[in-house]
């Protein structure tokens, strides 16, 4: 048989994959056979399979099969990759929930976020080199959802607005002590110290990130005001006024939430206040298997209900919940555009398969937040005996003024 001609087996595999996908506006092509869905919607993309094994892997396991085949160049997508992934997320097709459940349980065991497991998982994603992340993040190297005051705001302006919002939600005051877990490259801790006069201890187990953060703090003359600690958050022992964690809960692991809650309680007692910013879902379900295996080992974005297991055991009062899903979609659009403009550089640094995998990861993330498959939650909370509770949300939208600070708080006791 000619290498350009499909067999009966190939056509059956295409038909099987179509049944899984349903009437998605995506054409499937293998050699001389083209499968077009029965839909009135315009075709958004054409998926071209280079060989039968690529098609077979996708028919058996769409998530992992497509991710690996696309990364290896055995599948090409002609058209809008983000839009095609949006269609997939919005459809009812795909592998069964039971299959996903079993796979998730296996990955939970394999990638358990113990102290040793967490270090391995974080190293896999965050220690890829600072030069790689510098290609497509903002100038302060923030790798979490930004806040766009306007649709036209730059990524740099939006990331600064996010840090300002975090500080305002916490209502930081000069002289207070703050502990941050999962501090990334250090931007938020440095911003807090410079703009709000607080003293910060920031924990991280990524060696590359913590080294970068320490050098940055030294250049800014913040010795004694910001301390970056290369250690697991579970080893935190000091007392603080404020606990803050941006983009770490999704790395904690569902079976470690109670342990995490005890760490927070140890830090702020029943009178402090805290803030969590994390990727989540509307309902409990596993993370995409390919993302979890290849990109984010140990990752789990919880539902809002699941995340309450961090607050309820310690009798923390949840004061405010906000969803910035569309802000993360826009953040990712900026990252993706910068990544694409640096694609050839990424290939030279990491290889073509790596570059294609990360393109797919970023495209898939844009699609997931646009469609609501993923959410971005910010939760403000306080100890049950915290003496200060914000009376209104006005402080989020007006500049900080020291002389009006007392008017914005009401004493709980």
Language model: regions and residue ranges:
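Conserved SAM-binding loop of SAM-dependent methyltransferases across substrates and taxa
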Residues: 185-196
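Substrate-binding/catalytic lobe of Class I Rossmann-like enzymes that use SAM or dcSAM, i.e.
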Residues: 279-389
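Conserved SAM-binding loop
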Residues: 213-214
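A short acidic, Gly/Pro-enriched loop at the edge of an enzyme's catalytic core
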Residues: 234-243
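Feature captures hydrophobic
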Residues: 1-159, 165
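A short glycine-rich, Lys/Arg-flanked "PGG" loop and its adjoining helix->strand segment in the class I
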Residues: 258-272
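Conserved class I S-adenosyl-L-methionine
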Residues: 174-184
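Conserved beta-strand signature within the Rossmann-like core of class I S-adenosyl-L-methionine
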Residues: 271-279
């Amino acid at each position: 048989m000619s290498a350009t001609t499909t067999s009966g087996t190939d056509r059956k595999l295409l038909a099987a994959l179509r049944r899984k996908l349903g009437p998605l506006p995506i054409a499937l092509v293998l050699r001389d056979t083209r499968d077009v869905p029965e839909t009135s919607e315009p075709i958004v993309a054409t998926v071209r399979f280079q060989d039968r094994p690529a098609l077979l892997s996708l028919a058996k396991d769409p998530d992992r099969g497509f991710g690996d085949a696309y990364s290896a160049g055995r599948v090409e997508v002609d058209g809008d990759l983000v839009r095609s992934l949006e269609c997939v997320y919005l459809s009812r097709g795909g592998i069964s929930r039971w299959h996903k459940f079993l796979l998730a349980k296996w990955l939970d065991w394999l990638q358990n976020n113990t102290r040793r497991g967490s270090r391995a998982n974080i190293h896999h994603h965050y220690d890829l080199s600072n030069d790689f992340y510098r290609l497509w993040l903002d100038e302060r190297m923030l790798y979490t959802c930004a806040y766009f005051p306007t649709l036209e705001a730059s990524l740099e302006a939006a990331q600064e607005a996010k840090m300002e919002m975090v500080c305002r939600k916490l209502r930081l005051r000069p002289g207070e002590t703050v502990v941050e877990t999962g501090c990334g490259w250090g931007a938020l801790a440095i911003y807090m110290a410079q703009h709000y006069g607080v003293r910060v201890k920031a924990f991280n187990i990524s060696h590359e990130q913590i080294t970068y953060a320490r050098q940055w703090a030294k250049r800014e003359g913040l010795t004694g005001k910001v301390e970056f600690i290369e250690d697991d958050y579970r080893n935190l022992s000091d007392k603080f006024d404020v606990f803050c964690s941006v983009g770490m809960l999704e790395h904690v692991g569902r079976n470690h939430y109670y342990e995490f809650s005890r760490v927070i309680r140890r830090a702020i007692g029943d009178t402090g206040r805290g803030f969590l910013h994390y990727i989540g879902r509307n309902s409990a379900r596993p993370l995409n298997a390919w993302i979890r295996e290849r990109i984010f080992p140990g990752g789990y974005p919880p539902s809002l209900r699941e995340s309450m297991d961090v607050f309820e055991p310690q009798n923390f009062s949840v004061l405010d919940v906000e969803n910035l899903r569309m802000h993360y979609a826009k953040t990712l659009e900026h990252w993706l555009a910068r990544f694409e403009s640096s694609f050839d550089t990424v290939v030279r640094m990491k290889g073509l398969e790596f570059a294609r995998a990360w393109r797919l990861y970023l495209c898939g993330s844009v699609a997931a937040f646009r469609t609501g498959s993923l959410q971005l939650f910010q939760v403000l909370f306080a100890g049950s005996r915290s003496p200060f509770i914000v009376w209104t949300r006005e402080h989020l939208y007006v500049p900080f003024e020291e002389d009006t600070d007392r008017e914005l708080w009401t004493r709980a006791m």
